[in-house]
Amino acid sequence: MQQVQPRRASYAIWIALAIGAIVVISMISSYNGLVRLSQGVDAQWGQVQNVYQRRADLVPNLVATVKGAANFEKSTYIAVAQARASVGQLSPDVVKNAVNDPKAMAQFEQAQNSLGSALSRLLVTVENYPQLKANENFLTLQAQLEGTENRIAVERKRYNDAAQAFNTRRNTFPTNLYANFFGAQFSNKAYFQAQPGAQSAPQVTF
């Protein structure tokens, strides 16, 4: 009996060590996986910002071009300029935190969608101005804008896909336990919300 008890104690120690090793390995694997997926989300968020910035950069030339058209509706291009200004006034914290903060994401998205809607209205209004339809500079800007809107739709989807991959991994057992242990750095990623027509490229027939 005296020999059996030490053996049982030894077995218990080895079992505890084995369980501990499994937990540590699982935690390390989960941590590394979350880091990799989080970096993927951040990289894709950078791409989203790039295409939105590209669109914002087109606005000044576009507004300047339509302002040159005789009797062009002033309120239309003013709305575009104001929406563009609102995008530019988004605080760096909102842009930075949008990935992890649904409220910041909603604020970012609202500003961008407002600009997209204003641009769509402007391009539709252009149909009433033959001189703009024949303006080579405007046609170039219009083509660039449509291409950029298409890229925005693509990059938004890629971002949402990356965020979904992260969130799925983060909320799967036992990774969710480790993610909660590690804290805010592995909080769920925010999504872009689908809004009918908000992100479709403006279509104008010339």
Region annotations inferred by a language model:
Residues 1-206:
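A helix-centric hydrophobic-segment signal that preferentially recognizes long
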